[in-house]
Structure formats: structure tokens, C-alpha cells
Amino acid sequence: MIILGLDLSLSSTGWNLITHENTVLGNDKISTNAKKNTEFERIYIIANEVKELIEVNSVDVVVAENQFFGGNARTGLTLSKLMGAIIYVCQELEVQFELLTPTQARKILTGDGKLKKDGVAKYIRENYIDIGEYSDKEIKTKDIKKTSDIYDSFAISLAWNKQNNLNEKWNK
């Protein structure tokens, strides 16, 4: 089984592909630019890239972060549009679509639903894959890459895999 984990964002959607045995097949981010593209163009770009990832890698399930927006209704509306486009792609390709909240993912994966993002990234680095230090910002002058979106996507896919007991090592 191949699982595609997504941390949805218009500017930088983090993604990863893992097998049910937690073998990492790939990870990256899909970046769009608000100065070059409209909101709808950006949604279209991301949805098409996700569609290609699903088709090329024979993905069985897509798991995305279910986000809550207490403070910014506009961001919530935009991400809801993006989520709708991804759900449409999954339905069109007959691929299972699932959601986990960040708190659920942290609790399932590490046992601590309140663990901060950098703590979850450290857990993933130590137990699964090291894609570099956790960073919310890209600083080209210091060669620091933004890894937060990718680590967040790993938290979602690994937690969903663990929750569904798809990896036999979880059952030991």
C-alpha cells in the first residue's frame, strides 16, 4: 500500500510518499507564487501536481492535515477550496481520502498531542527520515531550507499508517 501525506498550503504544500511498512518513497513540497498566479491558478497547480503524484506512484490513500482556523477566516476559506480540489482529484481517481488533525497525528505518532512541531520533526528525524533541521523559513544566504511542511506531511502519513495498523511492527 502506498500512502501520500499532504500538509496543504497555497504557498508550500508539503508531501511525502510512504509504503505501509514506512519505507519512504519520496518527499518534497509544491510551491506556488502569489505574485505570479491567482488563487485559483495556484489551487489548480497544486491539484494537478497531487494528481500526478497519485497516478505515477499508484497511491492507495491520500491523508491530509485537517486544519482549524480560529483567527483567519480568509485563510480557512482558501484552504477549504484547496482541500475541495484535492478531494475532487481523489474521487476522480477512486483513491481513498482521509483527514487527521495535527493534534491527532501528534498523539498517535508520539503519544503527546501537545508536542510542538519541532519536537514532532525531531521524533521523525530520529525514527524515520532526516530531511534536515526543522525550519519554518527558507534562508538562502545560510543554505537553510524550509522543512516544516514536509515534516508536517510525514507526521500525518505516519500517524495514519500507525492508527490503521498497516505496519506489522506497530502490532508487536
Locate predicted features.
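Phosphate- and other anionic-substrate recognition elements at nucleic-acid/protein interfaces
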Residues: 1-172
